[in-house]
Design a protein with these regions (language model features):
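C-terminal structured domains
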Residues: 1-82
Length: 82
């Protein structure tokens, strides 16, 4: 998973620390997009990106976090089937 917000490194680190709280999901955080990245979390869509993108224009709400968890489960289930 790559996390990158246009609001800067401090905000990106804040979101990354929140994501680290999902310990039971075994999330690997990356500082940049790579061929191994399967989820991109940001405030900007990258049109050419074919992986799951989670876009938050404002601080995430409880519903955003629920959808985040669902997206992780979906990606993990897809990778198990491959």
């Amino acid at each position: 998973m790559c996390v990158d917000f246009s609001l800067g490194e401090l905000y990106t680190n804040f979101i990354q620390n929140q994501i680290k709280g999902f310990k039971n999901l075994s999330i690997i955080l990356e500082n940049r997009l790579t061929s191994k990245t399967d989820i991109f979390v940001s405030d900007s869509v990258i049109e050419s990106l074919s992986i799951t993108q989670i876009i938050w224009k404002r601080p995430p709400t409880p519903l955003d976090w629920e959808m985040f968890g669902d997206a992780i489960v979906d990606v993990k289930n897809k990778s198990k089937r491959m």
